[in-house]
Amino acid sequence: MNLMDVLSRKWVDSILDVTGGQQLRGKIKAEPVQGGVTLGTVHPYWTRRWGFQQGGCIHSGSHHFLTVFGPLDADCLIAPFTGDNPASVIALSMPGDAILSLGTSTTLLLSIPPSTKPPKRLTSSHLLSHPTEDGALIAMLCYKNGSLAREKVRDLYAQSSWDKYNELVERSPPGNNDTLGFYFPLPEIIPPNVQGEFFYDISDAGSPILKNDMPDEAHPRAILESQLLSIKTRILEILPEGAQPPHRLIITGGSSANQTILQFGADVFGMKTYVATRGKEAAAIGGAQLARYAWWKGRNGGNGTFEEMVSGDPETVRLVAEPRPEVFNVYEGLVEPYRACEGLIRAHASHGV
């Protein structure tokens, strides 16, 4: 549970009381602070015991590139840290980007710039404070059924071959001939407590009809469409009214090596799609960049944005797919049919039938 109100960025006294009472309030003292702030310097104990010392160097290395940020002008600095998901956002994206991790589970991290209207808070999503931009937020969606569900479909309907799977996806039309398929081999998080497979005829978009199955060759496209449409519909729900939609999609995880899936993401979300150039250590690099930000601002009188700091750094992502407008329009038209089908699945789960 977060002890902080993510909108005001202040501790919530009622939650502190339940968690640890006045003793906890006394320990945490001041309100949370924004990343990029220097809180002080390391205690002399760390110098005596572990060799922390005046001067030194901060560096970040990844494969063939090494950036040296220069000597420190004071003792080792103490700066706010963050978690692995916000750190990945720092390492890979800019405000207005979306990171989609397609691994064993599926996770979306959506950077939301500051707005006079806050994003919607849903029970199916998480809202985090952005570590480097005051007033900015990160929306997070987490799904249990990710690559393992796709692999099950591959094994059953594509001869356990990704090449065959991709071929079947590319041979079938966007919209899958007015059919939607949902695959939840494990109890899902979004929508909650749903398990099983569900197939719908959506030729009448307002009245989906439950089907027993669909043609074998339709399943590879069906699972991609339902998984990504679930995310697409929720982005539309979360963003504040009048907010600009994200403009870049950055895909990570094992499926980021599959060009067919990368193109699929570009088409469903209507965004240029990128993959990371820094491998699997994005969270660690993001944490180091946050520390660098505190040091950099200190050298600049406390001024400057994170984007200004990294403006001369090597690119962290590369373009791999661009949306096809005619395909994107198909998926825009599937948002409401998707919602109708998911509503029926939720009703099915709530009645236990």
Where are these regions (language model features)?
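Acidic catalytic cores of enzymes that act on phosphate-bearing nucleotides/polynucleotides
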Residues: 26-33, 92
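Active-site core segments that coordinate phosphate-bearing ligands/cofactors
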Residues: 3-22, 38, 43-252, 257-353
